[in-house]
């Protein structure tokens, strides 16, 4: 029954038929789940000698933990365990490195095509970014890491589904002291700025301009939020 509904919804969207189907967002970011996720993260630890490489994260179990399903979900997360996305993620920050690898292994690019009725109901990166906020270690993003997210994590044709506000810079705040910014979750900030910068990239063919915005606005704001307790 569920498969039939999902298939019918998918066909309706492809064919251009619009109809309202409520989407229920279930928050699975609890202390119990965070503890489970941290244990799963241990398999990504780099061996001290640096030669044996990293073990693969148990994608199937992590996916079950992070993504809840209900009768109102339009798309169910595929649990194939396939990790071959062709992307790479490298940063000196160990925690962010783990996060980036998980995003790749969970094939976040495919999941971003899900349509949501409201921007606040975006329920994918929420699960990936929220648990990292609770780890007792320094968290920081740099030019390389955020550039990977911008260039490889989102595609322009997927941004249409996210309903990014037209006045996003004003809403998100351009300084780290902005009250608007402080009230937002880090996953919203990252996702919104990535989307905004990708939209700018269409209108402006100036890479230095984009890099300047990333360096002066995007990275400081994200790091400011990640440092909050």
From Swiss-Prot:
Record has Transit peptide as a keyword: yes
The organism's place on the tree of life at top rank: Eukaryota
Location within or outside the cell: Mitochondrion inner membrane
Transit peptide boundaries: 1-25
Effect of mutating residue 98 to R: Loss of function, causes respiratory deficiency
Keyword list, A-Z: Activator, Membrane, Mitochondrion, Mitochondrion inner membrane, Transit peptide, Translation regulation
Single GO term (MF): translation regulator activity
GO CC annotations, alphabetized: mitochondrial inner membrane; mitochondrial ribosome; mitochondrion
Topology versus the membrane: Peripheral membrane protein
Biological process terms in GO annotation: mitochondrial respiratory chain complex III assembly; positive regulation of mitochondrial translation
Chain's role: mRNA-specific translational activator of cytochrome b. The cytochrome b (COB) leader RNA may represent the target sequence for CBS1 and CBS2, tethering the COB mRNA to the inner mitochondrial membrane, where cotranslational insertion of cytochrome b into the membrane can occur.
Extra remark beyond the main annotation: Present with 556 molecules/cell in log phase SD medium.
Name this polypeptide is given: Cytochrome b translational activator protein CBS1, mitochondrial
Species whose genome carries this gene: Saccharomyces cerevisiae (strain ATCC 204508 / S288c) (Baker's yeast)
């Amino acid at each position: 029954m569920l498969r039939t509904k999902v298939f019918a919804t998918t066909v309706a969207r492809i064919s251009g038929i619009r109809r309202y189907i409520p989407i229920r967002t279930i928050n699975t970011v609890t202390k119990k789940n965070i503890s489970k996720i941290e244990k799963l993260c241990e398999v990504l630890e780099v061996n001290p000698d640096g030669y044996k490489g990293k073990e693969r994260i148990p994608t199937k179990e992590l996916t079950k933990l992070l993504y809840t399903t209900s009768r109102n979900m339009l798309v169910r997360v595929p649990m194939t365990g396939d990790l071959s996305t062709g992307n790479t993620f490298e940063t000196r920050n160990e925690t962010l490195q783990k996060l980036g690898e998980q995003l790749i292994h969970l094939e976040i690019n495919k999941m971003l095509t899900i349509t949501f009725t409201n921007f606040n109901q975006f329920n994918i990166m929420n699960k990936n970014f929220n648990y990292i906020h609770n780890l007792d270690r320094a968290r920081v993003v740099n030019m390389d890491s955020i550039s990977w997210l911008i260039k490889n994590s989102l595609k322009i044709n997927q941004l249409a589904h996210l309903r990014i506000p037209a006045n996003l810079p004003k809403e998100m705040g351009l300084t780290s002291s902005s009250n608007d910014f402080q009230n937002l979750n880090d996953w919203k900030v990252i996702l919104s700025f990535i989307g905004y910068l990708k939209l700018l990239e269409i209108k402006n063919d100036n890479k230095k301009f984009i890099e300047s915005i990333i360096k002066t606005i995007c990275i400081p704001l994200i790091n400011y939020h990640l440092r909050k307790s």
